[in-house]
Amino acid sequence: MLTVAQNTDTAFNGSLTGPLTLIKSGTGTLALGCTANTFGGDYVVSNGILAVTASGALGTDSGLDLAGGKLHLGVSDSIRRLFYDGVQQPRGTYGSTASDAQHKDDTRFTGTQVLAVIESPPVAFTSRVWDAGAGTDTALATAANWVDDVLPPFDGTALAIFGSDGTAATVTTATSLYGVSFDRDANFNVDGTAALTLGQGGLSAVDRTSGRAYTVTTPLTLEDSQTWDIGANVTVQLSGTISDTPGVPPTLIKTGKGRVQLNAENTFAGPLTISNGTLRITNGGALGTTAGATTVRGDLGGKLLLSGTFTSDEPLILGGDLNNFGLLQLENGNVTLAGPVTMVAQTRVQTGGGKTLTFTGGITGNGNGLLVVNPGGGTIAFADKPIRIPGQTLYFDQTGFCVIAVTNNLWGDTLVSGGTLRCDLPDVLPPTTLMRIGVHYSPSGTLDLNGNDQTVSRLTLGTFDPGQRAIQSATPATLTVHQNASDVLDVRFEGAVSLLKSGTGTLTLTNAFSTTSGGFSVTNGTLAVSGEGTFGPNCTNVTVLGTGTLALGHSMAIANKAAVVRMPSAGVSSAKINLAAGVDVQVGWLFYGDEKKPAGTYGASGSNAQNKDTTHFTGTGKLTVLGDCSGTLVILR
């Protein structure tokens, strides 16, 4: 507890955090101006004025008791609970008569802005049990359908328990309940076209040992913030539209291990949190308006399921990955998520074969956790707005496609394993990313440039276990690697992809099965070919420029005898080809700058080459040039 007994006016722009109780006394004004407060305690204003000068300064999880003092609203803000002299007030907006608030009070508020209060005081309720005593008459308003033939009060103070008998209840007139509880150990429907208003009791269903389905087709109105607590092995389908009452939108929380399915285009505006179990949506408007975001607490076992073909504009807040369960999954169809996505912890998104999940609203992160992409044989795509998760890893480790079709992305490392990462525009990969292909439990992986040049800071393997690892492009495209570390790369180059190695490190190629028609270039550091590695039979362009070194460890490193090798002009000693002992690499032509060199053998002074040139060659092996200056190529056998 902190008591601020001040008779002067001061401003505090620092951060308030935790469950502190702050008591403002004295005749002065204390102004709060920090927008990043995470305060979850209570303010008590017993005298003077507590002023808000920045939205968010009070903290959305805080409580406020105006117990003799006033709140000045220079900007609008929101809190969880409001008290007048210790008595909690209902959810709504508050302010002076100069404001647009629902509840106006000049004795407690000054300024022209409003205070939004999210939570109402607890409501006293009674429970009534449905026994279906009226037989075929299933009307909710028939007394014989309730235990002791006594109707519940339909004024929002009754918890309706559908528990002892029957399979259906019908809402024939507009009805208000504290909440609905499904205790019936059989499937049950609540039907009708009249609105059913739910208060703080929300919806609940107990755990079952076998599957049970409860269906509500009548429209629902959310009167207050509430929890839908659905037990294990239970599915509650809501097919009527869901709206809320005017004022501050109520908050909605899905808990329990069971499932809620939303089938209608809904208009509720409050925030929705999936904290446990699953919530399935079957259309783009199921999550209500975009005024309130949907939060998925994967860390607690919450998961959002998408079923159908639609576009959703809902803002999403995603975080947590309990036991690699995932928190967002496309079950069937093709869905586009066009709203902004905020990552607050590791996030795993999933789909399956024949399905496409597309993110077009952009993704932002706080530096905490992986973005795990699990297509499961399908496609997960990112387009229109970028992924901006600095320091976090894009972790793609299943079969199928991860498609990047937007530029200006920012993340840390990139893992490609199991499937294909496809680049649908130039420069979609962050140039600072480390590209890792394969991982021990999924050693294969493909990077597909798809005709678009890309740049990465490092190219490496996540495992040396056998696997099908490839970098490809059906049409010409270049992967530039600014490699300052040294890595051995067992990766095939296929299609028409080219590799440009820069950076001070050494990149060693060991794969014997490359088939690309693209070229290989080195401008800094070392590009090495060793073991059974080769540029492949279709590569005809090899370039060694700048301060780069091409290290060739065996005679078939450049397999195409019609290949053209380009190096700096004569006398320029910055770039070199290193030829290991016993190596005789045969190529078509050799250029020093624009000068075509004559046929013959070339090497360093320690080689047995005809043309010894220490400015361009090192090692004791030799390079045999088969083509003469006239363009004739002579193949030696």
Predicted regions and their residues:
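Short Cys/His-rich zinc-binding micro-motifs
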Residues: 34
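Structural preference for solvent-exposed beta-strand-turn elements
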Residues: 99-101, 107
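Short, composition-biased motifs enriched in small/polar/acidic residues
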Residues: 122-134, 628-637
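Short, solvent-exposed loop/turn elements at domain surfaces
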Residues: 136-141
